Design a protein with these regions (language model features):
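Active-site gating/metal-coordination segments in enzymes
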Residues: 20-136, 142-145, 158, 167-173, ...
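Tryptophan-centric aromatic hotspots in well-structured domains and transmembrane helices
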Residues: 9, 32, 57, 128-131, ...
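Residue-level recognition of the N-termini of beta-strands and the immediately preceding loop/turn
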Residues: 5, 49-53, 82-83, 190, ...
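Active-site gating loops and adjacent loop-to-helix segments of metal-dependent hydrolytic enzymes
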Residues: 1-17, 23-26, 76-106, 150-151, ...
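Short, solvent-exposed loop/turn segments at secondary-structure junctions
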Residues: 12-16, 59-62, 90-92, 135-136, ...
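Mid-to-C-terminal alpha-helical segments outside catalytic/metal-binding sites
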Residues: 1, 5-6, 224-239, 246-286
Length: 286
């Protein structure tokens, strides 16, 4: 069995405020998560893991004006509940299979207004969850070097693409991906959140099957990604994640954690502790 003792909610553009300034509407999601956290605490005695915090959304393109949004997130929540911010910068250089990513600007992390907004995070001791795709990893490396005081969580292996013009090219893309994450790993302020490789955009095709993937299939196709990241970053800078509910298109929750346990089998007890708990506890301050 799996002993899930606590969870972190990561923004998903849900439950925004219906009124008020556009910039502050994402605070509604934080308010919603707080209400759910109270319910989860009530149910924790019955075996349901509590929500221990959240990663909220703020539009960093607001520049220094994003400070008002950050203050609103923090003021509506219990102290320490809001752990960080995710402003997705994922940009696909082709018409995507997933429509929500259309209309985004390329090179967002290089823009002065984005960087001005990003610079506000350290002031509030907030981390940054970086959701991007593999063609953007070098941009994130540059951002991490420019802001060493800000903790960055590298989400989902940097989104190795396997659809559109990248369909069927996983073997070709892997060495380039490895080269870029090797440089990123040299930034000590970057931590790796390992999971999210079973999304439709990764191109394994499990979402199109009648039966979801089993744990052995996941290990066979994903193990090299996991072992590469753990080798480069070290277990003390890596944490396993479920990326649910998005990964449920391809795999069940229990099966995914079974796969992660199989991947982690060669590591020591101390290293496993980092991968399954300690790194996440340190980074998200729980």
């Amino acid at each position: 069995g799996h002993n899930i003792v606590g969870t972190i909610f990561v923004e998903c553009s849900a439950e925004y405020r219906d009124s008020g300034p556009q910039s502050l509407k994402p605070v509604g999601e934080t308010e919603f998560v707080i209400s759910q956290a109270k319910l989860s605490n009530e149910k924790s005695s019955r075996g349901q893991p509590p929500i221990l915090g959240c990663v909220s959304h703020a539009n960093l393109m607001l520049g220094e004006k994003v400070q008002e949004v950050l203050e609103e997130h923090l003021s509506c929540a219990p102290k320490g509940f809001v752990k960080g911010i995710r402003h997705s910068v994922a940009y696909y250089p082709f018409p995507p299979k997933v429509g929500r990513y259309t209309g985004r600007l390329p090179g967002l992390m290089n823009r002065p207004d984005f960087r001005e907004g990003f610079s506000m995070l350290a002031k509030f001791q907030l981390s940054f969850d970086a959701w991007l795709v593999h063609t953007q990893i070098t941009e994130l490396t540059d951002l991490a070097r420019k802001f060493p005081e800000t903790t960055i969580i590298f989400d989902h292996f940097g989104g190795p693409l396997g659809i559109g013009s990248f369909s069927g090219r996983q073997t070709e893309i892997f060495p380039l991906w490895k080269k870029h994450v090797t440089e990123l790993s040299k930034c000590e302020n970057v931590y790796a959140k390992l999971g999210g490789l079973a999304m439709p955009l990764n191109g394994w095709g499990w979402d199109l099957r009648e039966r979801p993937a089993n744990s052995d299939e996941i290990v066979t196709l994903h193990k090299d990604y996991y072992l590469t990241m753990i080798d480069l970053f070290g277990p003390n800078r890596c944490m396993f994640e479920s990326n649910f509910p998005v990964d449920k298109f391809s795999v069940s929750y229990n099966v995914l954690w079974n796969a992660l346990k199989k991947i982690a089998e060669p590591f020591s007890i101390e290293e496993k502790s980092c991968l399954f708990k300690e790194t996440a506890s340190k980074v998200y301050k729980i």
